[in-house]
């Protein structure tokens, strides 16, 4: 009995020492990673005050992959051979002087090729987007490439799935990428039925316990469809019935665009790069980059960002865009958890006299991110930023427009997760027509929103302020 007691004591001491070494070692690794100090401190606090939970969360969500590469430089050069030839063959296009720096930045760090002669169509509801998408898919002759964060097994998902199966049986190549976490609850049989019909369906960065758990944090949030290399779609909408029907308490308001023209090359490149990541097959045939004519006047640059690149491409581009704005900068985002550079840029622009407006939903789909968003409002309103709370339903739109010349629509939210952890894609449009159209959409939505008054906001209950402040500490981790 005495020997057993001594053994228990020795085991307890050894366990505590090992546990202490692991926690301190993990904190040391976090510090040595030289990340953003705010994010580093958030992880240190979690590991220190909630060691067991913090250790599990760090193992799942905290490890950085910024020094890895998705595709070799040689492979990427082969992939963009045709788009590069088309880009170099363009006559000198006109880019507004104010936006040239932004375009050059994306060209240098993101290999994003700007193309003129594009036409766009904007969708603000799921019904019109899905109808247009299925109409174009029905015309497909050679290939259909689809990529979504969420592809639900519901009436909307099954409707699109059945059409894709029909096209595959007609001999059209169909490739589908879906995010493994975003589609976690979708039955395997749903995608297996597609595979049985000849559709190549792959999940992005599979999460299988206990292996590869660190992949949970790095998700593919992109929404891309490319049909025959001639028409493409991107924006904020996934494939699920709620994107059309909304919630019992309101509509689902989103923004998606259809692109015709050579800018489609950029979305094709993004899809094929991600396809290479999961399938290890590099698809470079010119059939996926056909000759494309002139469809309109829009100058468009497709920009991607990911958690493995050296730079935070889209976030840094937005910093340039905000800093370059002279008259106004309007933003729609479902989640407002900005990084410190973005936060400072917004406040600086407003203090310099730029009309900065941010629209977020009055009611969100997740309470914790909504509390985090609310924690930033007083700070930015004090600098003169106008905050609008959308009342008609859930605002999921990721839209930005500035000075009647620059606009962007895509999958990127104004939060740490989109800027740091997700694979994202946005279409940046240097075009007055596109900017004015999206500005009009923002102003129309403004009629269904209330302008938040700071003098009223600061009087909210102390316990709400406390909740917001606590959640804000975790903002870099959400």
Predicted regions and their residues:
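N-terminal localization/anchoring segments of enzymes in phospholipid and broader phosphate metabolism
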Residues: 1-316, 320, 324, 364, ...
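Helical hairpin unit composed of two closely spaced alpha helices linked by a short loop
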Residues: 321, 325-327, 335-357, 361, ...
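Catalytic-core elements of nucleic-acid end-processing and repair enzymes
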Residues: 398
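Active-site donor-binding acidic/aromatic loop of nucleotide-activated sugar
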Residues: 387-391
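CN hydrolase (nitrilase-like) catalytic-core segments centered on the catalytic cysteine
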Residues: 372, 384
């Amino acid at each position: 009995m005495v020997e057993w007691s001594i053994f228990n004591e020795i085991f307890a001491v050894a366990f505590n020492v090992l546990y202490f070494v692991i926690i301190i070692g993990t904190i040391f690794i976090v510090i040595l990673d030289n990340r953003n100090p705010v994010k580093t401190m958030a992880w240190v606090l979690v590991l220190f005050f909630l060691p067991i939970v913090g250790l599990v969360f760090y193992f799942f969500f905290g490890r950085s992959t910024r020094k890895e590469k998705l595709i070799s430089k040689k492979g990427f050069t082969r992939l963009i051979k045709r788009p590069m030839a088309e880009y170099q063959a363009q006559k000198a296009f006109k880019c507004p002087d104010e936006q040239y720096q932004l375009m050059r930045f994306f060209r240098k760090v993101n290999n994003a090729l700007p193309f003129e002669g594009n036409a766009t169509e904007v969708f603000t509801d799921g019904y019109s987007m899905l109808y247009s998408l299925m109409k174009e898919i029905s015309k497909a002759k050679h290939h259909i490439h689809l990529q979504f964060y969420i592809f639900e097994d519901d009436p909307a998902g099954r409707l699109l799935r059945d059409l894709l199966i029909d096209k595959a049986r007609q001999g059209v190549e169909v490739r589908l990428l879906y995010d493994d976490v975003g589609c976690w609850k979708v039955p395997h049989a749903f995608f297996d039925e597609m595979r049985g019909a000849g559709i190549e369906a792959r999940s992005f960065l599979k999460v299988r316990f206990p292996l590869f758990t660190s992949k949970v944090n790095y998700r593919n949030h992109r929404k891309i469809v490319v049909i025959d290399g001639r028409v493409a779609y991107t924006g904020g909408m996934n494939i699920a019935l709620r994107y059309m029907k909304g919630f019992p308490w309101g509509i689902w308001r989103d923004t998606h665009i259809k692109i015709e023209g050579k800018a489609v090359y950029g979305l094709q490149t993004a899809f094929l790069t991600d396809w290479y990541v999961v399938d290890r097959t590099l698809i470079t045939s010119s059939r996926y980059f056909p000759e494309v004519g002139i469809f309109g006047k829009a100058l468009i640059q497709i920009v991607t960002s990911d958690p493995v690149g050296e730079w935070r491409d889209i976030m840094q581009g937005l910093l340039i865009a905000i800093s370059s704005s002279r008259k106004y900068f309007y933003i729609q985002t479902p989640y407002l958890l900005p990084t410190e550079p973005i936060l400072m840029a917004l406040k600086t622009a407003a203090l310099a006299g730029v009309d900065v407006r941010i629209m977020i939903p009055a009611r969100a789909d997740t309470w914790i991110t909504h509390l985090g968003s609310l924690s930033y409002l007083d700070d930015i309103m004090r600098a003169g930023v106008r905050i609008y709370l959308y009342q008609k339903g859930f605002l999921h739109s990721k839209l930005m427009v500035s000075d009647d010349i620059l606009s962007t629509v895509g999958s990127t939210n104004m939060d740490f997760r989109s800027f740091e952890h997700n694979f994202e894609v946005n279409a940046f449009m240097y075009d007055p027509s596109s900017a004015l159209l999206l500005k009009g959409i923002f102003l129309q939505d403004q009629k269904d929103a209330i302008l938040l008054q700071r003098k009223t906001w600061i009087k909210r209950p102390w316990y709400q302020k406390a909740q917001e402040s606590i959640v804000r500490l975790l903002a870099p981790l959400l």
